[in-house]
A protein has these predicted regions:
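Short catalytic micro-motifs in class I SAM-dependent methyltransferases
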Residues: 119-122
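A conserved beta-strand element that flanks and buttresses the S-adenosyl-L-methionine
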Residues: 116
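A C-terminal cap/extension of S-adenosyl-L-methionine-dependent methyltransferases
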Residues: 192-257
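Class I SAM-dependent methyltransferase SAM/SAH-binding core
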Residues: 51, 57-104
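Acceptor-substrate binding/catalytic loop of class I
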Residues: 163-180
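A short glycine-rich, Lys/Arg-flanked "PGG" loop and its adjoining helix->strand segment in the class I
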Residues: 128-140
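Conserved class I S-adenosyl-L-methionine
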Residues: 1-46, 59, 63, 143-168, 205-206
Length: 257
């Protein structure tokens, strides 16, 4: 299990861990950068049916609701779903939260316009069935945004060391390159766009303050060294034209590390 000072760049069953992380200075900086990248790839979600897979305590789902989306969130943890429902009630948000497994999503095919899945593939034994399930519930022409832990980062290196010293969480953690994420999306029948990176600093508060202003510029150069990677993928429709797939426009395409 993670400690109260660890990052929700990893999953945990205790909602208070996430709240404590977001309340810390490094957590607030890191969450802002991660959120900016994911929301930029999602684009305008007003009126769109969005499924948040692995929604945790509902933080991203609430932001999508504020932006006008019709949001559903699922998570394997009842503790997280209870926390998400409580937050939605306090805010008066009309969001449906339910317990559900990413590899067996409890909805009919082609139900959603958009699916977002942030840091869930890194903790499943086989990402293939999860992405195939996501593709199943996504309508033709719909978008998936994936956010995952980058393989070649200082955060990943520290977590590997923790695994060597007995961390059961990080022994099962999987860090991926941008190319691997694109391949997984393609194997599920989706058409992946470019991969973008974020969080290039080590898990150290002064470094976060120093490097955060340069995060977007670094993402334009490379995904190597990024603790967080994200991409958008489209589910092909009949007669689908790749040139008009509708990937959200980012300033510059990043190279996949």
């Amino acid at each position: 299990m993670a400690t109260g000072t660890d990052s929700p760049l990893l999953p945990d069953l205790v909602p208070d861990v996430y709240a404590a992380w977001r309340a810390s200075e490094i957590g607030a900086i890191t969450e802002q950068l991660q959120r900016r990248l994911v929301l930029g790839l999602l684009g305008d979600v007003r009126g769109r049916r969005v499924l948040d897979v692995g929604c945790g305590d509902g933080d991203l789902a609430l932001e999508l609701w504020r932006r006008g989306a019709v949001v559903t969130g699922i998570d394997a943890s009842l503790y997280m779903i209870d926390a998400a429902r409580a937050r939605a009630t306090r805010e008066g948000a009309d969001i449906s939260f339910m317990v559900g497994e990413a590899a067996s999503i409890p909805f009919d095919a082609e139900r959603f316009d958009v699916v977002v899945a942030v840091t869930i593939l890194c903790f499943v034994a086989d990402a293939g069935p999860v992405l195939r399930e996501i593709a199943r519930v996504l309508r033709p022409g719909g978008n998936l945004v994936i956010g995952e832990l980058g393989k070649w980062s200082l955060w990943a290196a520290a977590r590997r060391i923790r695994a060597w010293f007995g961390s059961s969480l990080w022994r099962r953690g999987r860090f991926r390159t941008g190319g691997e994420l694109r391949h997984l999306a393609s194997q599920a029948g989706l058409e992946p766009g470019p991969v973008f990176g974020s969080i290039y600093y080590p898990r150290w508060q002064p470094a976060a303050r120093l490097f955060a202003p340069y995060d977007k510029a670094l993402s334009r150069l490379t995904t190597f060294g990024a603790a967080f990677l994200a991409l958008s993928a489209v589910k092909p429709a009949h007669g689908w034209d790749k040139s008009s797939a509708g990937f959200p426009v980012m300033a510059t395409r990043s190279r996949s590390a």
